């Protein structure tokens, strides 16, 4: 795997995870402390 491809994949994974944290945090279920 090329390093650039791996870098973009990692960046996308982090972005997706962060977006999920924000969405779940705004649902107000209180299970996540954001």
From Swiss-Prot:
The keyword Thylakoid applies. The 4 large subunits of the cytochrome b6-f complex are cytochrome b6, subunit IV (17 kDa polypeptide, PetD), cytochrome f and the Rieske protein, while the 4 small subunits are PetG, PetL, PetM and PetN. The complex functions as a dimer. The lineage of its organism: Bacteria, Bacillati, Cyanobacteriota, Cyanophyceae, Synechococcales. It is a single-pass membrane protein. This is Cytochrome b6-f complex subunit 8. Keywords: Electron transport, Membrane, Photosynthesis, Thylakoid, Transmembrane, Transmembrane helix, Transport. One of its GO terms (biological process) is cytochrome complex assembly. Belongs to the PetN family. It is found in: Cellular thylakoid membrane. The chain crosses the membrane at residues 3-23. InterPro entries: Cytochr_b6-f_cplx_su8_sf (IPR036143), Cytochrome_b6-f_cplx_su8 (IPR005497). The keyword Protein biosynthesis does not apply. Disulfide bonds: none annotated. One of its GO terms (cellular component) is plasma membrane-derived thylakoid membrane. Component of the cytochrome b6-f complex, which mediates electron transfer between photosystem II (PSII) and photosystem I (PSI), cyclic electron flow around PSI, and state transitions. GO terms for molecular function: electron transporter, transferring electrons within cytochrome b6/f complex of photosystem II activity. Its main location: membrane.
